[in-house]
């Protein structure tokens, strides 16, 4: 059904249809319960020392705190979020693309149009708002086909935080946000898959 809608909207004939799997065998995907998130992050960074990675955080404040924490400990990291001046955001993004900086700590504002093949890890410091967003964000890892690690740190407090923001919505927007949250929670709590 989705493919039919896309074909109709873009006016493609069925002869132009290519179907591929979302499965990326080079991505090691892990979900871990949050305990000491800063230490869990450091542990991951030590495994991928001097390699490129993205750390996604829920809020600008968390991005600033985590990037400052990492920089103070000698990691090559920069923040990226919509609250930064355009020039700073662009400078941090370009430094990451050029490998002048190894780690970008960002909100979901980061990533659209970025094609950096050598991203070795993606950490979700907080639960994403949707499974679709999560797939898109982890899809930035290992585009060169080499092994990469995707770590989602999960806790019920993340769910409560997202529920708080969902409660501010109304109607269909609220219903869709609840569906998205339920899907990512099911994924994070699925002990057979994760």
Task: Give the positions of each predicted feature.
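Cys/His-rich short segments
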Residues: 176-194
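Helicase motor core with emphasis on the C-terminal RecA-like subdomain
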Residues: 1-179
């Amino acid at each position: 059904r989705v493919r039919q809608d896309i074909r109709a909207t873009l006016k493609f004939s069925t002869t132009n249809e290519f179907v591929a799997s979302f499965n990326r065998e080079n991505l090691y995907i892990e979900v871990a319960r949050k305990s000491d998130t800063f230490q869990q992050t450091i542990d991951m960074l030590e495994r991928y020392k001097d390699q490129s990675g993205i750390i996604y955080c829920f809020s600008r404040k968390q991005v600033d705190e985590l990037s400052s924490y990492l920089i103070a400990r000698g990691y090559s990291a920069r923040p990226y979020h919509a609250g930064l001046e355009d020039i700073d955001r662009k400078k941090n993004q370009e430094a990451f693309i050029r490998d002048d900086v190894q780690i970008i700590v960002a909100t979901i504002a980061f990533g659209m149009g970025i094609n950096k093949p050598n991203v070795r890890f993606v950490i979700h410091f907080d639960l994403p708002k949707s499974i679709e967003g999560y797939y898109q964000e982890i899809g930035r890892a290992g585009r060169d086909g080499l092994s990469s690690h995707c770590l989602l740190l999960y806790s019920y407090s993340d769910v409560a935080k997202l529920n708080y923001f969902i409660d501010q919505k109304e109607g269909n927007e609220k219903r869709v946000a609840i569906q998205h949250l339920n899907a990512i929670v099911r994924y994070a709590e699925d002990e057979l898959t994760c």
